[in-house]
């Protein structure tokens, strides 16, 4: 089920909130918890119930292994160490095997066939929604159990930790000690109207980012990549690149706002996952702002176990690049994602290597270079193949044709704005007289929003009449734009 859908907004969310708080009010906290788990199952299996057995099996196996890791065994210390390492290895093999089969099997076999001229059959496996997210979340719990850093939670608590629907399909990747204590806090079992208002505002803001901005830009991006082989001009390629840069920004930012807002409605504060990444002054800074919980997971469970920065300069750079290769592979089974991760690893390593020179540059130059790097690397993230990405970059660098065709410019129109100014003669005349003004105004406005406003999660929330009006306006605007419902980009990872 999608946050940006009528059934979620008008059916699922009211039912879930009403049943959860209603059961708590009746003094049935266990039933409230179980109901929230079952509603999360409905949310997950809405489009394809076949996904449910995968997630349920994963939850059961990981919970049992974690229980065994937490158990006080009556053995010698050496025997316990061997047993726990064996259990952890089984758990990691199970989880990585699950991801490999559903996400990477066809990719692996396809490349095997190409390299060795074999003819192994592809299975055309449908990727279960959010498998990378709920698997990584459970891996973190299992590793923490191995380290003795977890409490003994019952199965319902564990299932709720994994399935809580605001973060189930596209993150953030939460830790057990971030959410489970909040569910156990009795003060969170009754409606907090300040949190409800805060959550509704965040949800409404995220809905506009997704349904109005990101989905509009998705049409422009699809047009640009679709016309790459049909004499796409250099200026059209540049505008397409910028359109995707802002599409993925507002798509992911919108999702994070909506997920955070939904958490607030249940009195649960989920960790920040997005913090104005296009304000970054370096690639290192970018990854302190983009997908924060994935960065935290890779740092804690991949980078540090590899040795981090403790084994010399060369090993540090190798570890950094390895982590970003894992990040790229995590995002998708395609060489484009791996190469995207590799480029970010190189960028991160070079920034560290030339730290003094970088910091001696003016901040404006630091921002410009970082933003340009992020833009160019997003091309690999979006392209269907590395060859297509290089063809796209070649088209940008050609500067042979700076014309922009009218059908492409029309894709940048926000329908609501067009409807307004078309009924105001003066504005309509101005807009009609300046070719491409829709694209110019939209992209300039998005630059302004990204660079001059705080992230919604950073702002101190104060419920006021003005904010209530803004919330209602955003909610209505977003809902009326839901005629063409589309998935969030990160649902595919």
Predicted regions and their residues:
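Membrane-embedded transmembrane alpha-helical bundles that form the catalytic cores
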Residues: 1-448, 456-492
């Amino acid at each position: 089920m999608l946050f940006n859908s009528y059934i979620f907004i008008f059916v699922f969310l009211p039912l879930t909130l009403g049943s959860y708080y209603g059961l708590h009010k009746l003094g049935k906290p266990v039933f409230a918890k179980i109901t929230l788990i079952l509603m999360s199952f409905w949310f997950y299996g809405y489009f394809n119930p076949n996904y449910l057995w995968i997630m349920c099996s994963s939850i059961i196996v990981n919970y049992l292994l974690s229980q065994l890791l937490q158990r006080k065994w009556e053995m010698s210390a050496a025997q316990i160490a061997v047993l726990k390492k064996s259990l952890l290895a089984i758990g990691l093999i199970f989880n990585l095997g699950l991801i490999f089969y559903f996400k990477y099997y066809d990719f692996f076999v396809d490349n095997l066939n190409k390299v060795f001229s074999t003819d192994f059959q592809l299975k055309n496996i449908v990727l279960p929604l959010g498998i990378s997210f709920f698997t990584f979340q459970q891996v973190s719990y299992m590793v923490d159990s191995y380290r003795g850093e977890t409490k003994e939670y019952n199965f319902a608590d564990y299932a709720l930790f994994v399935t809580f629907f605001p973060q189930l399909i596209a993150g953030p990747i939460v830790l057990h000690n971030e959410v489970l204590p909040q569910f156990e806090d009795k003060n969170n079992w009754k409606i907090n109207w300040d949190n409800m208002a805060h959550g509704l505002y965040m949800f409404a803001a995220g809905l506009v980012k997704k349904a109005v901005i990101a989905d509009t830009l998705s049409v422009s991006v699809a047009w640009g990549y679709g016309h790459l082989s049909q004499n796409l001009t250099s200026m059209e390629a540049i505008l397409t690149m910028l359109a995707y840069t802002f599409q993925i920004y507002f798509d992911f930012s919108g999702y994070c706002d909506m997920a955070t807002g939904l958490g607030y409605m249940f009195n649960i504060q989920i960790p920040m996952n997005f913090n104005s990444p296009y304000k970054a002054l370096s690639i290192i800074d970018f990854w302190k702002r983009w997908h924060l919980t994935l960065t935290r997971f890779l740092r804690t469970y991949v980078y540090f176990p590899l040795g981090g920065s403790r084994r010399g300069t060369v090993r540090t750079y190798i570890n950094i690049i390895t982590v970003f290769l894992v990040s790229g592979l995590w995002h998708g089974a395609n060489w484009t994602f791996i190469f995207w991760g590799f480029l970010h690893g190189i960028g991160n390593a070079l920034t560290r290597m030339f730290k003094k020179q970088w910091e001696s540059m003016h901040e404006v130059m630091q921002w410009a270079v970082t933003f340009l790097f992020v833009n160019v690397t997003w091309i690999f993230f979006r392209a269907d193949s590395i060859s297509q990405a290089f063809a796209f970059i070649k088209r940008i660098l050609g500067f042979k044709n700076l014309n922009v065709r009218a059908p492409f410019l029309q894709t940048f129109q926000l329908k609501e704005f067009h409807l307004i100014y078309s009924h105001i003669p003066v504005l309509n005349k101005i807009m009609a007289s300046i070719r491409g003004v829709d694209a110019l105004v939209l992209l300039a406005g998005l630059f302004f929003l990204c660079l001059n406003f705080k992230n919604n999660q950073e702002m101190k929330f104060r419920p006021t009449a003005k904010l209530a009006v803004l919330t209602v306006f955003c909610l209505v605007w977003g809902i009326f734009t839901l005629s063409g419902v589309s998935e969030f980009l990160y649902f595919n990872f």
